[in-house]
Structures are given as structure tokens and as C-alpha cells.
A protein has these predicted regions:
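Hydrophobic residues at beta-strand termini and immediately following loops
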Residues: 6, 103, 127, 190, ...
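Short, acidic/polar
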Residues: 17-27, 142-149
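Active-site catalytic loop in hydrolytic enzyme cores
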Residues: 54, 83-153, 167-174
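Active-site-proximal beta-strand elements of phosphoester/diester hydrolases
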Residues: 1-10, 14, 90, 132-141, ...
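Short beta->alpha transition motifs characteristic of CBS
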Residues: 43, 50, 92, 103-109, ...
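CN hydrolase (nitrilase-like) catalytic-core segments centered on the catalytic cysteine
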Residues: 60-74, 143-220
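Cys-nucleophile CN-hydrolase/nitrilase-fold catalytic domain and related Cys-dependent amidase chemistry
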Residues: 15-16, 23-96, 101, 166-178, ...
Length: 220
């Protein structure tokens, strides 16, 4: 499976410009099977503003993902804030034919106040695509190894989409290797870049093999 990891900055309060920027980054990328975007890739990780959430029935960002998947004939995944009987940090996996599955983030980042506005998910989600089984995970889930336990070899790749700050990036790097090694699975991890107030994000997106070795990656 060929995967494009898209590490990008987010234009404050402009979903349209942010999505256009992603399209520009992908313009020079040849055909791949899967495009992976960061956590809340269209709006940024905003745990105080409920207005960033779109209807679960079908908002503009999910429709954009479906259009991108169809145009590129690739699956597209990343997380979006949605309103579904309460706000959810929803990690979508969208197929080229427009069908999709999703995972709602289970471990909300309480230290940042995510739990005040968002409701946690319950069940993990494994998607099989082109013969590869992918476990959908979101940011803070990385710190909870039991939640990604590869019992009976139920998945081949764990995909983490994140907004992980620079101040804790050494933990990100180490935990990605740990999750790969302990589960004997590949890890695909995509983090954003940029600055929001006092928070800096410097990427470190990467693909890690089941021995904990970095196959490919981006620094910042």
C-alpha cells in the first residue's frame, strides 16, 4: 500500500484556505492508495469553540474529503469536529466511492479541556482497505497502549492523526516506536505544523515498521 502523509499548517478561521493549501500540497503527489491528514486538519484543535463542528449528517469538510477521494481515487482519512448528539472528534476513513467509516476519539485530552466540550467515543475501529487492516487512532490515544493492543493480529497498521505540540514531541517519537514494537504492526502517524497562540507544532510525521524503525518521515 502506498500512503501519502500530509503534514501541514492550518490557516486560522479559514477552512477554505486551509483545504486549498492541502490540495496544493497534494498537486505534485503521484497516485497513492491512502492520503492521511492530521487531527482536526481543517479547523485546528479548538476545544473551546463549538462553532467549528459540522453536522454529522454531512458537513462541508466531510464532503471535501469525499470529493478529494473521488478525484484522486485514493482513500482519505483525518479527523473533523462534528456534532452528533454532542460534539465528537471524529476520525473519518473515506473511500473513493464516497462511502466512509469513522472512529470517535476515545481518550480526550483533559489537560487541554477537550473533555469539557467533546464526548468520548466507545469502540475502536479497524478498516480493511485493499487487503490491509488499519486501526484508526487519534492523538492522545497514543498514550494508552491497552487501547491499541493487537490481540490476535487483528490489524496490520495503526494510523494516528494528531495535533501534538512541540513541547512534548520527544514523547510522540518514543511512543510511536513503542506502539509499533509491542504490537508487531506498522504505525502511520501524521501531526500538524504551525503556531497557535503559545503552542507550537513541529510535525515529526512518520511511518514506523514493526521493529520500531522509521521507514520515512518529515521533521518540521
Amino acid at each position: 500500500m502506498e500512503i501519502a502523509i500530509v503534514q501541514h499548517d492550518i490557516v486560522a478561521e479559514s477552512v477554505e484556505r486551509t483545504l486549498s493549501g492541502i490540495e496544493s500540497l497534494l498537486a505534485g503527489v503521484e497516485a497513492v492508495d491512502l492520503v492521511v491528514l492530521p487531527e482536526m486538519f481543517a479547523t485546528g484543535f479548538d476545544v473551546d469553540d463549538a462553532s467549528v463542528a459540522e453536522p454529522a449528517s454531512g458537513g462541508g469538510v466531510r464532503r471535501w474529503m469525499q470529493s478529494l477521494a473521488a478525484a484522486r481515487r485514493s482513500a482519505v482519512e483525518g479527523s473533523v469536529a462534528v456534532d452528533d448528539n454532542g460534539l465528537r472528534n471524529r476520525h473519518y476513513f473515506v473511500c473513493p466511492d464516497g462511502t466512509y467509516r469513522y472512529y470517535d476519539k476515545r481518550h480526550l485530552f483533559s489537560f487541554g479541556g477537550e473533555n469539557r466540550l467533546y464526548r468520548q467515543g466507545v469502540s475502536p475501529c479497524v478498516v480493511e482497505y485493499k487487503g490491509v487492516r488499519l486501526l484508526l487512532q487519534t492523538c492522545y490515544d497514543l498514550r494508552f497502549p491497552v487501547f491499541s493492543r493487537n490481540c490476535g493480529g487483528c490489524y496490520d497498521v495503526a494510523v494516528y492523526v494528531a495535533s501534538w505540540p512541540k513541547s512534548r514531541i520527544s514523547a510522540w517519537d518514543t511512543l510511536l516506536q513503542a506502539r509499533a514494537i509491542e504490537n508487531l504492526a506498522y504505525v502511520v502517524a501524521v501531526n500538524r505544523v504551525g503556531t497557535v497562540g503559545k503552542l507550537e507544532y513541529d510535525g515529526h510525521s512518520r511511518v514506523v515498521d514493526y521493529l520500531g524503525r522509521t521507514v520515512t518521515g518529515v521533521a518540521d
